[in-house]
Amino acid sequence: MKKTNSLYVSSPVNALVKGILREDKTLKEVLEHGDFGLGTFNDLDGEMVLWDGVFYDLHSDGKTNVADINLETPYACVTHFKPETSVIVDEELTFDTLKKKIDSLFLSKNLIYAIQVTGKFKSIKARSVPKQEAYRPLVDVAGDQKEFFFEEEEGTLVGFWTPDFMHSVTVPDYHLHFISDDKQRGGHLLEFLSSKVEIKIQPIEQLNLDLPHSIEYLTAGLDEDISDDLDKAEH
């Protein structure tokens, strides 16, 4: 029997959207569930990439560093990356045309997909946010985001595609973070233009969701539809 691929989510994304920006889940604990993924750190102090078993902190100035394994996260999505499809695209792609290319590789839009895109990028537009005060809604935090541009980079996009019906659990549609090959630059992907890339995808059929036990989480009102706020914050 084929072993089922699983996505681990450390906390529902709707908690993050509502301003619960701190939890006691360490990166070391998250690493038990995968070697590939993304997320953020407590107080939204940088974007996160987990790639090849190493966590990176993508700061609000576009610079990156290896993250301390004892740091904590309010939201992380990880998997053990075992790609089943690989395609080389030797032509220019934008974010929109990349989405169409990857869409054509999906088995079904009722599954989750881990996505890695590695290669040469003519330009990258990305963002991150500076450290925040607790309990600030994510849509308000988005106003503080810092955008930056990289040119003629070689690097990797790391992330997931998730069905819309899961929007209270994790970020729906495409959610990708960029990190340069030298691990010095990165951020939450907004736009790009590539010249040659290799796309690898992995279908995921199982979800492993942790529900925090913090007072903030247990007493939060999480029944509201957060899809509009999440879309504004992520795009």
What positions do the PLM features span?
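Short helix/loop capping segments that flank catalytic or ligand/cofactor-binding pockets
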Residues: 58-59, 125-126, 168, 186-188
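Long, positively charged binding patches that form subdomain-scale interaction surfaces
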Residues: 96-160, 167-169
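Histidine-centered divalent-metal-coordination microenvironment in nucleic-acid enzymes
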Residues: 171-179
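A glycine-rich, hydrophobic loop/mini-helix early in the fold
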Residues: 58-103
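A hydrophobic, small-residue-rich beta->alpha segment in the mid-to-C-terminal subdomain
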Residues: 180-222
